[in-house]
Amino acid sequence: MIDYAEFQSAIGLNWYDIDPNLQLQMRRLLDPADFDWLEPELRKVGALCGGPVAARAEITDKHSPELVKFDRWGDPLDEVRHHPGALATKRDLWEAGVSGPRLYNEARRRGRHLPEVVPTALNYMLSQAEIGMLCSVGMTSGVIGLVRRFAPPEVQREFMPHLTAEHFDDAWDGAMFMTEKTGGSDLATLTTTARRDGDRWILNGSKWFCSSVDASAIATLARPDGGAEGLRGVALFLVPRIRRDGSHNGISIR
């Protein structure tokens, strides 16, 4: 039982260690072989969420991201600038395996699959510390799953080393741009188009709600020219924010 009266503030505490119910559920749901190596990781994230992540959130909540449309010369930039505290949290979460693939990779090295209850526990702790970041940091694993399942080999070779990088500086985070003004769940009304141009596709349209708007690898939906009406004419695309030559990929943020 948690005696809340002994806490002046939750910030500065380990949010795994002070949560007996979370510890109980991990012992109950995890195989003992997994629990032995995963509990130290859970404890590490508990200290991270209860410490620097929660402390930074007190500051970053008062400093919203800033959209910079143009550079000093008037050329399109469309860059989202974050408070340094938000970037530090993003880095810490990636390195700890909350948003990055480190724990999945470690489980694979052990010949295991990472139990689904573990990401749930990590997100449970993060949601109490920095709820505003929970959506964006959860996008990368979804994009990884789509690339592994649907992308041709040459696309996988280009994207997967970055999407699965364990170190933040080498990593590309994922995003999902799906919702349009015509409706969030009615994909049959999607209006974004895709036109073939040699070995590339040119997408034209607008998305209304973008999860992790400034991420590097964007999963999105568009309707190829000549495609069928309704859902059967919708296709899935993977869009890099930056082209191979380092140039801006024509994505405009409003």
Question: Regions from the language model: what does each represent?
Answer:
Residues 141, 149-151, 162-167, 180-183, ...:
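Acidic, glycine-rich active-site loops and adjacent beta-strand->loop/helix elements
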Residues 151-192, 196-199:
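Internal maturation/activation junctions in enzymes
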Residues 143, 176, 194, 203-205, ...:
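Buried hydrophobic positions in well-ordered alpha/beta secondary-structure cores of metabolic enzymes
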Residues 200, 204-251:
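A short core secondary-structure module
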Residues 1-112:
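Extended, charge-enriched "interface" segments that sit outside catalytic cores
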Residues 76-170, 211-213:
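Internal helix-loop-helix
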Residues 120-123, 173-175, 189-192, 217-218, ...:
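Short glycine-rich loop/turn motifs
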Residues 172-178, 202-203, 249-254:
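Short Pro/Gly-enriched beta-strand edge/turn motifs at strand-loop
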